Amino acid sequence: MTTLFIVGTDTEVGKTVVTSALAAYWQTYHSSESLGVIKLLQTGIGDVEHYQRLLPHVEVVNPLRYETPVAPPVAAEKENRSIPLDQVWQGLNDLQQRKNLVLAEGLGGLGSPVTWELTVADLAGEWGLPTVLVVPVKLGAIAQTVANVALARQYKVNLKGIIFSCPRPLSHEEIVNFAPITLIESLTKTPVLGMISYLENIEDITKLAHIASSLDLEMLF
């Protein structure tokens, strides 16, 4: 059984695209091996519904959800609810017992709050989850990557590598300038597993699988 925790430097950076691409690849090239997708916590509507449409024959789990689309501690306070992380852990553990691969998507960024005391980095480190960091290709990507890798090290996260994701159409020159792989690997001492180009339709499973096949997947599976 393999578990990958997909985290980002921030919200809306491509975590769902990367998770979808990895799921599409597994469904296409490892169809005989079971797959589970879990959104550990969700606020508002979005990711879970996307996975259910994209992967109708895959078990998609969301152990904890709030209606208000803000950070979980704020959402829980607004809805007069608690944040039972044991429920989240149990949902993940149950899925791990039954699947060959579990793709777990985080929320927000690595430093985003999960409770009033804990961040996504705390969960990744304390739960020992092999983690992939998704970084958007834009001006400032180098600093974001360095800062988040440092945060991962501080919390003893098992960081397997970095995947860059293009949030909009970019030229080759822009990609090279915004996310110079050699420089980033030198600064972070962490492998860059590849680049996810901009996709207008993130529910095209064939394109998603093709894009994922260009990543250095031997580092993950």
UniProtKB/Swiss-Prot annotation:
It is found in: Cytoplasm. Its main location: cytoplasm. Pathway: Cofactor biosynthesis; biotin biosynthesis; biotin from 7,8-diaminononanoate: step 1/2. It catalyses: (7R,8S)-7,8-diammoniononanoate + CO2 + ATP = (4R,5S)-dethiobiotin + ADP + phosphate + 3 H(+); (7R,8S)-8-amino-7-(carboxyamino)nonanoate + ATP = (4R,5S)-dethiobiotin + ADP + phosphate + H(+). GO terms for molecular function: ATP binding; dethiobiotin synthase activity; magnesium ion binding. It comes from the Bacteria. The active site is at residue 39. It holds the Pfam family AAA_26. Keywords: ATP-binding, Biotin biosynthesis, Cytoplasm, Ligase, Magnesium, Metal-binding, Nucleotide-binding. InterPro entries: DTB_synth_BioD (IPR004472), P-loop_NTPase (IPR027417). One of its GO terms (biological process) is biotin biosynthetic process. Substrate binds at residue 43. Belongs to the dethiobiotin synthetase family. Homodimer. This is ATP-dependent dethiobiotin synthetase BioD. It comes from Crocosphaera subtropica (strain ATCC 51142 / BH68).
